[in-house]
């Protein structure tokens, strides 16, 4: 779709170090999408780490907006594990499950991607689905891993021409939340729920 130079950027990406509140902010937004009238359909994915007794953290992917309290949930898919560093990666989960969760999005909805990091570096179909979403009109709210700029696809996401990038800190997260909330819900109140943000 051709966009004019004055068109607001339709997608929002959060970048911050761990424990800064990226996921908490995204979950607050999702809660409001469910409470709205009408509610906004949620698509995409979220990831969660589960700490094990052996010190290993196992990472699972879930459909965005669903409960992530149980790694044994039928909606959970194993992504890999870490123990100070990445131990293993299940690229097939990104390529099949993750790609399907992104491509299932329909107009009028919101695509959540929380979070995009370095484990998916070999998942070409998954990364293509991400960039296709960023090239599209269905609004995206994503978080990306904070890095030193050495991971090419993360830099491409942050610098995508239709992305509004927020570098989140403990000091600015309330202000950022207010801006994002306004961007997502202002068009809905004006009856433009099938347009980009």
Predicted region positions:
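Hydrophobic anchor at the beta1->P-loop junction of P-loop NTPases
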Residues: 14
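N-terminal phosphate/diphosphate-binding loop that engages ATP/GTP or pyrophosphate donors
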Residues: 30-84
């Amino acid at each position: 779709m051709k966009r004019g130079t004055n068109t607001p950027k339709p997608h929002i990406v959060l970048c911050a170090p761990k424990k800064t509140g990226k996921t908490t902010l995204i979950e607050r937004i999702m809660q409001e999408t469910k409470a709205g009238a009408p509610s906004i359909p949620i698509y995409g994915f979220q990831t969660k780490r589960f700490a094990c007794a052996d010190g290993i953290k196992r990472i699972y992917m879930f459909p965005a907006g669903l409960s992530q309290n149980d790694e044994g949930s039928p909606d959970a898919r194993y992504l890999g594990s870490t123990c100070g560093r990445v131990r293993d990666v299940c690229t097939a989960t990104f390529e099949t499950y993750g790609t399907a969760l992104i491509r299932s999005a329909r107009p009028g909805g919101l695509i959540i991607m929380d979070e995009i990091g370095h484990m998916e570096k070999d998942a070409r179909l998954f990364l293509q689905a991400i960039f296709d979403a960023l090239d599209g009109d269905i609004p995206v709210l994503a978080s990306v891993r904070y890095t030193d700029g050495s991971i090419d696809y993360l830099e491409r996401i942050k610098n995508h021409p239709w992305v509004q990038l927020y570098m989140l800190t403990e000091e600015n997260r309330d202000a950022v939340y207010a801006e994002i909330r306004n961007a997502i819900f202002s068009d809905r109140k004006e009856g433009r729920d099938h347009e980009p943000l």
